[in-house]
C-alpha cells in the first residue's frame, strides 16, 4: 500500500483517481488542485507517490515536479495528462517524473503503472 498525493485541477479527475486508488488498497493522503498546492501538500504529508496533471493553474505540473524532485529525488511521480505530445512528456520525465499516463485512461492502466513504479522502488 502506498500513501499517494493526487494532483489535478479537475475535481472529477481527482475523484476518479482517488476511487481507483482506494479500491486497490492505496491511501490517498491529500488532493491538490494546482501545482503550488501540490508542492505545499508534498512538504506537509511526505507521500510515497504523486499523481500529477501537467496543465494546472498557478503552477503547472512540470514546474511542481522540478521543485519536488529537487527536494526529494526519491519520491515517485506519475504524470496523468491529456497532453500526449512526446516533447511535453519528455520534458516531464527530465524534470523528475517517473512515468506517465495519458487521459483518458482506465483503472487497469493506472494500477499497472503504479504497481510498476512501486515494485521498481
Over which residues does each language-model region extend?
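Active-site beta3 strand of CheY-like receiver
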Residues: 45-51
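Two-component/phosphorelay signaling modules centered on CheY-like receiver
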Residues: 11-30
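Receiver (REC) domain active-site loop signature in two-component systems and cognate sites
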Residues: 56
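C-terminal output helix
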Residues: 105-114
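Acidic catalytic/metal-coordinating carboxylates
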Residues: 34-37, 60-63
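Short, conserved "switch-loop" micro-motifs in signal-transduction and mechanochemical regulators
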Residues: 83-84
Amino acid at each position: 500500500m502506498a500513501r499517494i498525493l493526487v494532483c489535478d485541477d479537475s475535481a472529477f479527475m481527482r475523484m476518479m483517481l482517488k476511487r481507483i486508488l482506494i479500491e486497490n488498497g492505496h491511501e490517498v493522503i491529500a488532493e491538490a488542485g494546482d501545482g503550488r498546492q501540490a508542492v505545499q501538500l508534498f512538504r506537509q504529508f511526505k507521500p510515497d507517490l504523486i499523481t500529477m496533471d501537467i496543465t494546472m493553474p498557478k503552477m503547472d505540473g512540470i514546474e511542481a515536479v522540478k521543485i519536488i524532485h529537487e527536494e526529494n529525488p526519491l519520491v515517485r511521480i506519475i504524470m496523468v495528462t491529456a497532453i500526449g505530445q512526446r516533447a511535453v512528456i519528455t520534458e516531464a520525465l527530465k524534470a523528475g517524473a517517473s512515468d506517465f499516463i495519458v487521459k483518458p485512461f482506465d483503472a487497469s492502466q493506472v494500477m499497472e503503472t503504479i504497481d510498476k513504479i512501486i515494485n521498481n522502488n
